[in-house]
């Protein structure tokens, strides 16, 4: 993507990444896909281990939910999940064009990282999560809030409201 994070329509450019959510049981890993058109979280999955399947299942969930065209670019960092043959094969089978950050350059995936910063600042760091199940519930509620109720500064709308304007 060469840091060109502007999308003119839904499902043109997605970014993906994994972050960890601390709980008393250990870390819960959260994989998300964010649409750069409206900043909505298209799909997300959680797991107690950071595996290739966590990422693959997130892509599958996004594919079930959204229309994927050959124009779609999916940007990630160079984590082992995103450089795996399984990831390459799945994105190719869906007609998704892969894009990756340059090695050692976190700014290339800034918009995926930005969502995790918002999630942790507004939600996760305010509570002490006791369990994986509690963390999953909190993440579910926050992502619903983020997509459907949280106003984006740039558009003055929620991600879903902004997306509906394109479809209308």
Regions of interest found by a model, annotated:
Residues 35-36:
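Short, acidic, Ser/Thr-enriched surface-loop or helix-capping motifs
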Residues 92, 96, 118-168:
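C-terminal domain-tail junction helix/linker
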Residues 40-41:
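Hydrophobic "anchor" residues
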């Amino acid at each position: 993507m060469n840091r060109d994070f502007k999308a003119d329509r839904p499902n043109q450019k997605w970014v993906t990444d994994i972050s960890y959510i601390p709980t008393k049981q250990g870390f819960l890993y959260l994989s998300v896909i964010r649409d750069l058109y409206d900043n909505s979280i298209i799909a997300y999955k959680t797991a107690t281990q950071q595996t290739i399947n966590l990422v693959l299942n997130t892509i599958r969930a996004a594919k079930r939910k959204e229309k994927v065209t050959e124009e779609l670019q999916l940007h990630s960092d160079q984590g082992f999940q995103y450089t795996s043959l399984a990831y390459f094969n799945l994105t190719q089978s869906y007609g998704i064009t892969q894009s990756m950050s340059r090695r050692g350059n976190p700014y290339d995936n800034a918009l995926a990282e930005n969502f995790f910063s918002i999630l942790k600042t507004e939600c996760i760091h305010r509570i002490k999560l006791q369990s994986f199940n509690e963390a999953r519930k909190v993440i579910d509620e926050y992502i619903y809030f983020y997509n459907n109720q949280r106003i984006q500064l740039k558009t003055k709308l929620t991600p879903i409201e902004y997306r509906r304007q394109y479809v209308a």
